Amino acid sequence: MGREPDRIGYFSFTKKATQEAIDRACTKFKVPRKDLKWFRTLHSLAYQWLGCTYTDMIQKQDYKDFYNQHGIDISKSIKTDDVPFGEEDSGLSLIDLYRVKNTSLEEEFRNHGHIKGGLQRLQRIDKLYRLFKNQRGVKDYTDLITEFNKVAQSPRLDIVIVDEVQDLKPNEWEMVRIMMKQATATYLAGDDDQAIYSWSGADVSKLIDLDCHLQVLNQSYRIPKTIFAKSNNLVSRIKKRINKEWQPRKEEGKIRNTNFESIDLNEGQWLILGRTNYYIDEVSKELKNKGFFYEKNNRLSISNDIATAYRSWIALQNNEEISYSHVKIMYQFMSVGNGGVSRGKKGLPGADMESQYSYETLSKEWGLNTPLNYSWEVALIRITESDRNYIKHILRSGHELDEKPNIKLSTIHGAKGGESQNVILFSDISKRINDNMWANRDDERRVFYVGMTRAKENLYIVPSTSPYEFEEILR
């Protein structure tokens, strides 16, 4: 690598991104994972550097206790994982927002507009929350960054790499600058056109104003010509941005403005994007009514266990063997007794967890009494009627419960970093987003730019049937 692995730091926002970076580094440079001790999220770095333990961190039970004491559910408004708190909440997120932006609760309240209970309610909740943490001796994620910055020291790293810097909040920029002071070289990777988390405190202006050597990756391996032209036209309207020269793939690609009902989803890979979960939920209902099998926000339209039980029974009928874990899941949905699984056998006591199991083995040794010619809905009698009807609807419609559905639904924010052969992008926005958009339209330009650029071949833009839509993508 040219440097000792423990003198290199790679920092990103999600555990998934850091794990992927570790995998790539281990493969390319032939180093053991344990040597890459500073490949972490920023919060994990602060946690490690401050010497924190599990008991130092606020837990779900603490939030439940806070609710029981004060009747206030603050858990969805404070950062507790790799993803930010929800965009459309009751205003309680301002209690976290002012801390990550290094501002004040009063300032964020003025910028936000009306909130039920007003500023006094927010101040009271903020005080109660701080007192609660102090009494229990616990920290939340934002406290980790705050305390790291107060110490103003970091691991002595020769090389610092920070990914997705367009999403850094002011307190995280402060943290990065502390590391930069001690580093020989710093590499910041990001795209200001994809800065879509301003509502959670991210400050893209710090990237745009950065005085540094700029290197643009000038070739896209995803975006075809037509989608390149339309998406570039959209972001060119952003008032303050870094101008970039880059090239699309040589393929043309296609863009259509059309209604959702006219699109044939049976063939190819599809990613359906909405600005908020409300629109995704509406599409989800329609797809379920039509018998499509799909994935919404990384979850199957039917539970993983039900899908696994169904596939397992079909596999046994096809004379295939199934794994120990799949047998256990399948047994959950079978009755106990003569027509199902013998009493005491559902948990597979004493079975080898590494083995594969045929129908013959299960029926002779592991209590499976269900005849092999029984249909899946008879064999898996404990699947609820509504789920059975949905599976039958999927099968009647000519679809299958494949391992990976060909249709995925997501908010635009949830799909960042993803891609698909075909993308359907709804132009709908909520009234709240519409009202806020006039103060900073550039934020929505960036969001819909991210949505458009998920498409590898075809982009279908669906006009809104409501008064509220981001009409710029229809031009």
Place the predicted regions along the sequence by residue.
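Accessory N-terminal region flanking or inserted into the helicase ATPase core
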Residues: R7, S75-I161, P170-M175, L188, ...
